[in-house]
Amino acid sequence: MIDQRVTLKALAVAVLCSYATYSVAQGLGDTPGPETPSEIAPLEADPQILLNRLGTLTGEGDAVEATRLANEIQERWTHTGSATLDLLLQRGIDAMQDGDFVRAIAHLTALTDHAPEFAEGWNQRATAFFLTDRYGEALSDIEQVLILEPRHFGALAGLGIILEELGDEQGALRAFRAAQQIFPAEENVNRSVERLEAATGGRTL
């Protein structure tokens, strides 16, 4: 049970934090130069267009492009349009990575209070709540994320992680399958689907 718990915590950090951390750092750092691997045309800057494309990348050879595209999507998700609010998000993520969850939750709560329409603020606070075993609050925040952005693959994966931690394997499988449909090249999610299909016989209520 302890090993499984540690594995789920590590998976939560990998799935819920990685893309947002990359994206916010990109936004607050230097502007990428001309050697950026793949540019996205302005017409395709809408995350919904990018999400449509992400769902078509299903082959083993698509993993690098899918990860790049997921990062592009999260880069758009992690910008509020306000430098002050973007900084609150970055401070919350930094505090979470430092293990200071009280400070992380404080920053992210300030963010959700000031920008309740900003899905990523709720998503990152859900991560902090999960990592401090506050599952009810984490689930509530994930629900808010999915109201604002139903195709938030990180939040869906996070929902799967929490439900599995709570022993709801069928609910977890449904959540991971939903994330897989949006981001089929995500290895952590694919492994979770395989594991839970084996555990449940592939059945969900």
Feature annotation, model-predicted:
Residues 2, 17-86:
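N-terminal leader/linker segments that initiate helical-solenoid repeat arrays
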Residues 2-11:
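Bacterial N-terminal signal peptides that target proteins for export
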Residues 28-37, 41, 68, 75, ...:
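Terminal, low-structured helical/coil segments at or just beyond the last alpha-helical repeat
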Residues 54-61, 74, 112, 146, ...:
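A conserved position within tetratricopeptide repeats
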Residues 82-154:
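Alpha-helical adaptor scaffolds
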Residues 97, 131, 165-166, 198-202:
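Register position in tetratricopeptide repeats
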